[in-house]
Amino acid sequence: MSTLGILLPIALLLPLANPAENGDGQAMPRTRNLRSLSFGRTLRRLEKRGCDPTDGCQTTVCETDTGPCCCKPNFTCQISNSGTKSCSCSGQPSDCPV
């Protein structure tokens, strides 16, 4: 039997074994959207470092290893001893909202 003769019946049967269906003909809701999940984590991580990725970079822009970051007011782009850049508080900790 040729390769086409083997693959054709398999291709025809695949829609019958749809794992997205839960048996009653309804598709199961997706529990995760991995792309948006990882993007959300990146935004939270940037915000923790004093970065505001949503302000359109009206403030200081810092080229970090995870991409460009917009430093919040009272934050400056600083290079650490290991060579990585991040937004760090340039004044008193009370001047820099987290």
Swiss-Prot record:
Keywords: Cleavage on pair of basic residues, Disulfide bond, Gamma-carboxyglutamic acid, Hydroxylation, Neurotoxin, Secreted, Signal, Toxin. Expressed by the venom duct. The keyword Secreted applies. Residues 20-49 form a propeptide. GO terms for molecular function: toxin activity. Residues 1-19 form the signal peptide. The modification 4-hydroxyproline is found at P53, P68, P93, P97. Contains 5 disulfide bonds. It is found in: Secreted. It comes from the Eukaryota. The modification 4-carboxyglutamate is found at E63. GO terms for cellular component: extracellular region. Its main location: secreted. Injection of the synthetic peptide causes a hyperexcitable phenotype in mice greater than three weeks of age at lower doses, and lethargy at higher doses. The cysteine framework is XIX (C-C-C-CCC-C-C-C-C). Negative results: has no effect on glutamate (NMDA) receptors, Kv1.1/KCNA1, Kv1.2/KCNA2, Kv1.6/KCNA6, Nav1.2/SCN2A and Nav1.4/SCN4A channels, and acetylcholine receptors alpha-9/alpha-10. This is Conotoxin Di19A. It comes from Conus distans (Distant cone).
